[in-house]
């Protein structure tokens, strides 16, 4: 099992300017966060240039996150929903250009009124069907991520239900450890260790970060209360074959946090 990082801690910088640092630190696998001023996913020439830069620095793009600039595939207003679907599809094409494999998708954002939960779930599935059809023709796999409480897909059981409904080899689950820890703490749902056997046949990607079960802190492992020993043992038991992808909150000292990531990973798997 290899480790990688989401570029989230670097999102305030042009990603190109940090590739030398990543190479020096031996970080070979990335999940790209598409954000203007950080990584311009909508510019084909830029993507081709970055593809060369990644290869030149020995870096492989494993995954890309869907945009978070207002994109929400569960929106009820059809104009906004379709716009969101198209933005996600643009990131799929960007990922394809970088020879990446996994597109991380949130099933939806905040549910303002519980009465609309079922409607938003329906819209989310409608959008997901369209995105999945688009991605299947390019061989890109969608990893549906469990979200924070109060959002569409805020439980492992709901994520699992959606994935099983589509029954597609191009749709799997991205387990976000931090989100799962909060949901299990607040709503008494399955925690990060307990849920692994439930999702083992669909788990294709990870977002690894820690918290104390109250807020989405995106800490390094062992800075919160997640049972990391049990989690790593659980991954081995289900024979997880994906990348151990850290998703940490941005820090002021990027080099320090990136060095710590590597140390943290080797401490976890030792």
What are these regions (language model features)?
Residues 14-17, 56, 73-173:
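Active-site acidic/histidine proton-transfer and metal-coordination neighborhood
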Residues 40-43, 47, 78-81, 85, ...:
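Flexible, glycine- and charge-enriched loops at secondary-structure boundaries
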Residues 45-57, 127-134, 194-198, 230-234:
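Catalytic-core regions built around general acid/base machinery
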Residues 9-11, 34-36, 67-70, 107-111, ...:
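Active-site-proximal loop/turn and secondary-structure-junction residues that shape catalytic pockets
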Residues 31, 63, 104, 143, ...:
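Conserved beta-strand positions in the central sheet of alpha/beta enzyme cores
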Residues 1-100, 172, 190, 201, ...:
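N-terminal pre-domain/capping segments
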Residues 1-4, 12-26, 84, 155-270:
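Histidine-acidic metal/acid-base catalytic patches
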